[in-house]
């Protein structure tokens, strides 16, 4: 026996189907069932989307935020492609242009928008609830108001669409309650 470290082939998945266990053990990521326990790390979440990632694609927005922090998987794969290539694949949403190096990070050889850039892009272009939630997630993961505003300042030209909205969301969310801890506080033995 050997552990499952990647997506199982369809024939193995078909043989292992059990309606009661599927919802506990598997989650659909871009239409492919993935074992939940493999999605507990950024590397595992990246592995779940890498097969669908176009060559030289940079993960953006909700996809990048999901890779970094987890949560419900994205319904589409959002990527930035050099040269403005487009895709007709229903699960792939492409954007033209390049991100500044300061707005990207590399995870297992794949370039991905930082938490700050992903949150800013969602705040600029996403639905209102998702926009506020993205900034709250960034705040809860230690991203400061200054970092978010500096990242927003990198959005120039066509990428400046939605910047006033994003700035307003950042100001409102970051001026509110103090950041919540990502991990629950440790029990204090003294009291």
Where are the language model's segments positioned?
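Short gly/ser-rich loop at a beta-strand->alpha-helix junction or flexible surface loop bordering the NTP-binding
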Residues: 1-191
């Amino acid at each position: 026996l050997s552990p499952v470290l990647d997506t199982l082939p369809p024939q193995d998945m078909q043989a292992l189907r059990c309606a009661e266990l599927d919802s506990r053990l598997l989650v659909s990521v871009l239409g492919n069932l993935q074992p939940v326990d493999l999605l507990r790390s950024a590397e595992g979440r990246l592995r779940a989307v890498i097969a669908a990632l176009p060559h030289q694609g940079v993960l953006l927005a909700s996809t990048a935020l999901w890779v970094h922090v987890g949560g419900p998987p994205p319904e589409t794969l959002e990527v930035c492609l050099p040269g403005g290539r487009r895709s007709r694949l229903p699960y792939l949403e492409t954007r033209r242009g390049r991100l500044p190096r300061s707005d990207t990070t590399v995870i297992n050889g794949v370039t991905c928008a930082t938490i700050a850039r992903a949150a800013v892009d969602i705040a600029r272009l996403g639905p209102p609830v998702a926009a506020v939630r993205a900034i709250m997630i960034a705040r809860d993961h230690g991203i400061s108001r200054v970092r978010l505003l500096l990242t927003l300042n990198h959005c120039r030209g066509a990428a400046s669409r939605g910047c006033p909205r994003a700035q307003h969301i950042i100001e409102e969310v970051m001026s509110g309650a103090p950041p919540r801890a990502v991990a629950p506080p440790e029990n204090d033995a003294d009291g």
